[in-house]
């Protein structure tokens, strides 16, 4: 997850919490596990706050912070990434994710 702001709170947080508590099923594959394994952001403050507030609602995840947060996250080899940053910050993170060969969803 790249960006933990308003879009995360309104869209992705409820999704991840629901999938964790109720599961996700696809007829073609059976049960599908979708979890946050890492969050990349400038300061990590929102990710840390969410981790503290979500105890038991989702599995824990790593918070990557700083100017190279996306690169730190990509070093963990995620299956896919979602960029939910302000529009003017989509390109750089998205480019790095695609160049790493990771599936990408851009909000």
Labelled PLM ranges:
Residues 1-102:
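N-terminal glycine-/serine-/threonine-rich beta1-alpha1-beta2 phosphate-ribose binding loop
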Residues 106-107:
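Hydrophobic residues in well-ordered beta-strands that form the structural core
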């Amino acid at each position: 997850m790249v960006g933990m702001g308003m879009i995360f709170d309104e869209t992705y947080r409820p999704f991840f919490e629901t999938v964790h508590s109720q599961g996700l099923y696809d007829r073609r594959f059976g049960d599908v596990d979708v979890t946050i394994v890492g969050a990349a952001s400038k300061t990590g403050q929102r990710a840390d706050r969410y981790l503290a507030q979500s105890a038991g609602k989702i599995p824990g995840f790593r918070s990557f912070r700083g100017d190279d947060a996306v690169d730190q996250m990509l070093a963990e080899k995620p299956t896919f990434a979602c960029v939910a940053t302000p529009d003017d910050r989509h390109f750089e993170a998205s480019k790095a994710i695609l160049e790493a060969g990771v599936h990408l969803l851009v909000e």
